[in-house]
A protein has these predicted regions:
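Low-complexity, intrinsically disordered Gly/Pro/Thr-rich segments
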Residues: 97, 107-109
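Glyoxalase I/VOC metalloenzyme domain signal
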Residues: 1-6, 12-31, 44-95, 113-127
Length: 127
């Protein structure tokens, strides 16, 4: 077996509307409605399906929990501009700009939390 990439992930959230508002307003993701009024967020060629806590679609994670994710997104925007934009949008910065290692090499990152307290990392790969 040879796995090529991740098709989508699922976030279990306490409030789908708050999650949609955050990810579309703060990160510029697009809202997609599919199937039986299911909601997803897209960016580039990636997709995050949203499950409302207590009303998850089957099959689901064994213990679906809001706020347990730690996600790293690579931005085309310079990390210094990312940090400034987050501050302008009144997002509390947990840490940044810091050196980290991503899947393809060294990155510079900024950390903050979404409405469910998931840890969100926005990064740039170093040239």
């Amino acid at each position: 077996m040879q796995i090529q990439n991740i098709d989508h992930i699922v976030l279990t959230v306490a409030n789908i509307e708050k999650t949609i508002e955050f990810y579309t307003r703060i990160l510029g993701f697009q809202l997609v409605t599919f199937g039986d009024n299911r909601k997803a967020l897209t960016f580039g060629n990636q997709k995050i399906n949203l499950h409302q806590k207590g009303h998850e679609f089957e099959p689901k994670a064994k213990h679906p929990t809001a706020g347990s994710a730690d996600l790293c997104f690579i931005s085309a925007t310079d990390i210094h501009n990312v940090l400034e934009e987050l501050k302008q949008k009144n997002i509390e910065i947990i840490e940044g700009i810091v050196d980290r290692t991503g899947a393809l090499g060294k990155i510079k990152s900024v950390y903050f939390r979404d409405p469910d307290q998931n840890l969100i990392e926005i990064s740039n790969y170093l040239s």
